[in-house]
């Protein structure tokens, strides 16, 4: 909401006071009828409105709104405040927080949540109130015997808690899509272990492509009859590396005479391999 007095504020003005500042420079000034440093906190009885109506009553703020409000007693001779509103009630949550200034106890902060309906079956909402009151407020109001007024002024900060449900849900969806994409990429690749290096080959390739992979290792070694396949045919290891050194050396001299039968032996796995017809035997 654009504040009614925003034109009187300097450019870039932000109102984010600390708990101590709210007590010492705003609530205390209001309680003693002194002008506040900035007059942007209106005087409104917040219990006469539902919380979603209050932003329209605020002087300043987009995500949180401040108000000076009185508090009335729930019972004539009691000290409990009346928390009832138009269509619900405010319920205290957590423990009160003591506020100090220069190691001196100066105020109390209480957190409340708005519930729709009547207690004890009210429906919890996302509207939150932080209520600030002076530490000596009880001693002042105790003199007002017979009056329903409990406090002349307390300071309230009201805001709506952000709903993170949709954000978390979107993060899960994006994570699932990323996992599905990774699985699809893995299924379209074949992992070949031929020594210290591991590489992945596409399912469809030509024999000329294999011959160009000089970094892959010895082609005849890979095409030998001593390769061991697992049950899925994806991982291949040379069983007799020691005994076949001479054989491998001899086969390296005949690389150009590789036939399509050897190629079929090398790619003997469940998914068919498409070999460039140029290299098929005539």
Swiss-Prot record:
Keywords: Coiled coil, DNA-binding, Nucleus, Transcription, Transcription regulation. It holds the Pfam family NAM. Residues 9-161 form the NAC domain. Residues 161-188 form a coiled coil. Transcription factor that binds DNA motifs 5'-CGT[AG](5N)NACG[ACT][AC][AT][ACG][ACT]-3' and 5'-CACG[ACT][AC][AT][AGT][CT]-3' in target genes promoters. Promotes leaf senescence and reduces fruit yield and sugar content, probably by establishing abscisic acid (ABA) homeostasis. PANTHER family: NAC TRANSCRIPTION FACTOR 29, NAC TRANSCRIPTION FACTOR 56. This is NAC domain-containing protein 1. It comes from Solanum lycopersicum (Tomato). The gene is NAP1.
């Amino acid at each position: 909401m654009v504040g009614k007095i925003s034109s009187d504020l300097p450019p870039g003005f932000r109102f984010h006071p600390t708990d101590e500042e709210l007590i010492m420079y705003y609530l205390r000034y209001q309680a003693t009828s002194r002008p506040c440093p900035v007059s942007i906190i209106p005087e409104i009885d917040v219990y006469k409105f539902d919380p979603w109506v209050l932003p329209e009553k605020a002087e300043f703020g987009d995500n949180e709104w401040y108000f000076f409000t009185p508090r009335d007693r729930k019972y004539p001779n009691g000290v409990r405040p009346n928390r009832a509103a138009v269509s619900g009630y405010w319920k205290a949550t957590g423990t009160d927080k003591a506020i100090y200034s220069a190691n001196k106890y100066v105020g109390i902060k209480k957190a409340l949540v708005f519930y729709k309906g009547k207690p004890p079956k009210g429906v919890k909402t996302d509207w939150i109130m932080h209520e600030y009151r002076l530490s000596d407020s009880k001693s002042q109001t105790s003199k007002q015997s017979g009056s329903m007024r409990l406090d002349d002024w307390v300071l309230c900060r009201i805001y709506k808690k952000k709903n993170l449900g949709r954000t978390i849900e979107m993060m899960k969806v994006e994570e699932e899509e990323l996992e599905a994409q990774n699985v699809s990429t893995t299924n379209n690749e074949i992992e070949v272990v031929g020594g210290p290096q591991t590489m992945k080959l596409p399912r469809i390739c030509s024999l000329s492509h294999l011959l160009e992979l000089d970094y892959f290792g010895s082609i005849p070694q890979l095409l030998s009859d001593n390769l061991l396949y697992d049950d899925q045919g994806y991982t291949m290891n040379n069983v007799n590396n020691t005994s076949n050194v001479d054989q491998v050396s001899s086969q390296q001299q005949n690389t150009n005479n590789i036939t399509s039968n050897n190629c079929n032996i090398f790619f003997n796995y469940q998914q068919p391999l498409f070999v460039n017809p140029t290299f098929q035997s005539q």
